[in-house]
């Protein structure tokens, strides 16, 4: 389990703001954040590739016992978005898509938790990954044709895991 960084949300917000303002130090800050949190990104990728990933609830500890915290997961997903941006900047569309799909898989896994608040967190993570990263931050047009196919296939696979599909695929 990676070490928690209580300042991560603040550092991520500063990094995203630097990119929005086209600050020259933004890439250096992103590189620093990605290196400092490599263990967290590796754990996210490992969990995304588990066939039966879920969040273990410890009911005996009460309601707060090991419930996923929205801020921690939000920070982890934003870290994954930074990794995807970095991969795109290096021309690696497929690696960028894999980071985004890892994020979406985390959201999907949380949707299967029997606690409403946690399920809503899962929805938020999927939304951040698909809408915020791909649309608002302009990643979608930067993906290669192979990256787009990989993204479509990955989202279709994730959609099939949901009780009520979000996507409709024709043909």
What is each PLM-predicted segment?
Residues 1-171:
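Aromatic-rich surface patch/π-platform used for binding flat ligands and interfaces
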């Amino acid at each position: 389990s990676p070490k928690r960084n209580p300042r991560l949300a603040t550092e991520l917000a500063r990094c995203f703001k630097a990119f929005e303002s086209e600050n020259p130090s933004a890439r250096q800050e992103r590189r620093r954040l990605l290196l400092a949190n490599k263990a967290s990104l590796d754990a996210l990728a490992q969990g995304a590739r588990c066939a039966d990933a879920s969040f273990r609830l410890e009911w005996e500890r009460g309601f707060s016992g090991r419930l996923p915290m929205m801020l921690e997961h939000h920070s982890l997903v934003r870290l994954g978005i930074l990794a995807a941006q970095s991969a795109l900047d290096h021309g690696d569309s497929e690696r960028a898509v894999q980071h985004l799909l890892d994020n979406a898989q985390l959201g999907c896994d949380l949707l299967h938790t029997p606690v409403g608040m946690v399920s809503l967190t899962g929805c938020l993570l999927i939304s951040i990954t698909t809408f915020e990263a791909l649309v608002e931050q302009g990643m979608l047009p930067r993906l290669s044709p192979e990256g787009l196919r990989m993204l479509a296939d990955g989202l279709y696979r994730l959609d099939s895991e949901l009780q009520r599909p979000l996507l409709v695929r024709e043909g």
